[in-house]
Amino acid sequence: MPQLRWLGHAAVELNLGGKHIVIDPMIKDNPVSPVKLNYFENNLNLIIVTHDHYDHLGDTVELMKINPKAYLFATYDLENYLATQFNIPWERMIPANVGGYIDFDGIKLALTKAVHSSEHSDPTGAIVSGEGVTIYHAGDTGLFEDMKLIGEIFKPDYVLLPIGGRFTMDPYQAAIAVEMLKPKKYAIPIHYNTWDLIKVDPNDFVKEVSKRGYKALVLQPGQSVEL
């Protein structure tokens, strides 16, 4: 059974299609992470990074070192930076940009637009699809109208949306995003309450999503959901 676990902040662990995947793996500096970095040692198939801010790039370099068979999925420009600065070999990269699906051993991957900032590459969201389940991780983003197209093209079952405000959408804006994305199952809030700067009440998101006829699922750090 495919499974999703929230690791706090924007970090998400997926077990999907026989693959162990982590998205935006800030572990060491994540005050609410339920796991230590050694949990992932020799235990990952794929790392996905939406953009290079420290709270998303996180422990990617170290995770690539302690998982010598793992691959990295990110934009070409971000991967080029990591290859140049940290000697991550290109043969372990899956370079991409915003566009259509890429096959990774039976798992389908894609990058989407995000409205945010990033030093070494444009910011993105990520699509992961396998075992009949499609997940959209929005990365860091404000609200943008092309979310309608993301919903139309990829038809996500689950959407993971930042709701902390200040640097991303707030609960109200994220609920509007849900209405545009039209998830078949649940909208899951991320990127909130890690620090005081992004402190919000996730129940505000739940209420706004419900008003629009969709379902939100609030996970605690370390909590899983079967997909």
From Swiss-Prot:
Coiled-coil features, chain-numbered ranges: none
Keyword Calcium: no
Keyword vocabulary terms for this entry: Hydrolase
Family: Belongs to the UPF0173 family.
Alphabetized SUPFAM superfamilies for the sequence: Metallo-hydrolase/oxidoreductase
Pfam families attached to this UniProt entry: Lactamase_B_2
NCBIfam families, per the entry: PRK00685.1
PANTHER family assigned to the protein according to its UniProt record, in alphabetical order: UPF0173 METAL-DEPENDENT HYDROLASE MJ1163, UPF0173 METAL-DEPENDENT HYDROLASE MJ1163-RELATED
The keyword Repeat is assigned to this record: no
Gene3D superfamilies from the UniProt entry: Ribonuclease Z/Hydroxyacylglutathione hydrolase-like
One Gene Ontology molecular-function label: hydrolase activity
Protein name in the entry: UPF0173 metal-dependent hydrolase STK_14180
